[in-house]
Amino acid sequence: MKVCLISAPTANQFDSRAVGETEAARIMGELAPVGILSLAAVLEAKGLQPQVVDLNRVYYSWLQDSNRDKASFCSFAGAYFAGRDFAGVDFFGFSTVCSSYPLTLRIAAEVKRAHPESAVVLGGPQASVVDISTLRAFPWIDLVVRGEAEQTLPELVDALTAGRSLAEIPGITFRGNGDGGIVRNPEAPLVADLDALPFPAFHLFPDVRFCRHFPLELGRGCPFSCTFCSTNDFFRRRFRLKSPAQMLADMRRVKQTYGISSFELVHDMFTVDRKRVVEFCEALLQSGEEFTWGSSARTDCVDEELIALMAKAGCRGIFFGIETGSRRMQKIIDKGLELNDSTERVRSCDKFKINTAVSLMAGFPDETMDDLRDTAAFFVDSLRYDHADPQLSILAPLAGTPIQTQYKDSLVLNDDVADMSYRGWQQEPQDHAMITAHPEIFSSFYAVPMPYLEREFLKELRDFLLCGMRAFRKLLLGLHQDSGNVVHVFQQWQEWRTRNGLHFSNGDRTAYYAQTSFPADFFRFVRLHYIPAASKAPLAMTALVEYETALLGRDHESDAVGDNPGQVSDSSSDDMEGLLSPDSRLQLRRGVNVITIPADYQEIVRRLRQRGPLHDIAEKPVKLAIRRTPAGPAEVRQLTPLSAELLGLCEEGLTVQEITGEFLLRNIEIPGVPPEKACLAGIEILRQQRLIALA
């Protein structure tokens, strides 16, 4: 039997078409579909040679097609599967997730149309929980494989090959023989020993060598029971980990085969078993090999000692699901975190330079404005830590979760759906009709009732915080600290924006907040309204808004600034070890900008990090050098008086001899250091900081 396994499409989940296209290379290079590659390896162990299709790669082929405006992605995918590469395929198995389930079903219909005699089968978390209703609603789906499929899939393929009855195969849902009834067999047993599973068939993924963060399954199952989460149901709350020896062997194999040593270790709750985490870290350290990795954890299942060990063993990223900043809501949703401890865990990760995703949600049925303020406060408070990346989504009632079950009869379809089910810019009317007709299948595209909050307010607050964090991180934190709560600032901003006629073009709120017009408008609001009318620390706020304005300007001018005759490219061939001669002519590097702000920037940042007072910041004009690099975030340096003078002279394109002469004329004195020596040393420091270079 010829088998084709197909990944769930995720590349359509962008805020806009433009974003989707620019993210293409990154997504293609980083997201190997490890789930279907693991199943492919199981089939290979049984002597089969499965095909693997990554629908994200098909999606990007469609983006590059000159005729894409004449055909939808679904039609393009249908034509792709109708091609000769799939002639003779007997079994098409689709992995599914909630966000792209409508699209997957429509592509499956195209496959069935092209291959009517082939079995079209669904698996994965979404199909597993809506198996019966899916088979009833969509006749082109033949079977659903529920839950973990490593045991079920080979048995199913064998039975279909031999024409045997499916009645004894655990973990499948299918149509009865001739009577149209749905048969749901008992659950398949969970995989008890994950070490016994074969190594995923990464050789079937053409872009595997381009993965920057290689996915490897670390374990399965979460023993907790949060009311909004579907993970515990899919894995039946059975927590399992691969052994440290097995994980180390897998990581070595990837490094030897593909030359990749950075890993995304896939597990929803790695740190539940502290002893096993310690064993894993110690095994990595004892190996003497340099691997970097990231995983997920609960903040109450780590402490600073464990975080330090994880960092030493190569951990560079942790996903923390905080969910809500409200103590009251922590209890209601059965998350049960102590939020002060959660903040400490984020701080500890920052201390050891571990990047943290701080995941938060809003839109719970019992959530009040006070609860929302607490969540927004936790979001912005996380910005104190350079290595923290807070996230904010709106609750999606996932099928089969306690929240969805409780509110299934009162769900409301929204045009602007929950983040976990973002449909993508190219959603077609067929998807909308499908979702509207079957709320029990597509519940994650609906919203739960919120008697205490307005949904439009919540959605705009989300966009404001997410886009504000990206555009003016320190100013957002400063406004939160100055006002007492960022939601108060947001409400003032809303009123000011409306009063000044700043309406969303075509009603597209998300597009407005994603564009450069938003920070420009917001900076005007801060200068013209917030600082004179509401700020307790006007000097600090003025310094921050001037800093963010300059920084934003460099972000959007970085591509053009290299054309400035007074600057040289940051990728210049200038030799950092070369000697300067008196005739060497110096210029600013590309992307370097010098600004003056009215207060000590370093002191403001220190107080923001430590939650110190901002109202007594003294007036002290300082110069900042902002250096934008092509591949990363801006570097900001507060200049000493000596560096500021020298950088100003370099802006004029003078030679070293001319700069030294001007330096002496200005009678700049450095105690205990001859002026000429101080000048040359200062020039070399600026050069090492990559602020200046030889012209």
Identify the residue ranges that each predicted region occupies:
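Glycine-rich beta-alpha loop elements in corrinoid/cobalamin-binding modules
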Residues: 35, 42-43, 49-190, 400
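Low-complexity, glycine/alanine/valine/leucine- and proline-rich hydrophobic stretches
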Residues: 595-648
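Long, charge-rich, low-complexity alpha-helical segments
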Residues: 503-576, 631-695
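Radical SAM [4Fe-4S] cluster-binding motif and immediate context
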Residues: 31, 195-365, 370-377
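N-terminal [4Fe-4S]-dependent radical SAM core
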Residues: 1-2, 9-24, 169, 175-215
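Structural recognition of alpha->loop->beta junctions
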Residues: 134-151, 312-317, 374-392
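A glycine-rich beta-turn/hairpin centered on an aromatic-Pro dipeptide
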Residues: 551-613
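C-terminal accessory regions of radical SAM enzymes
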Residues: 4, 9-26, 173, 370-524
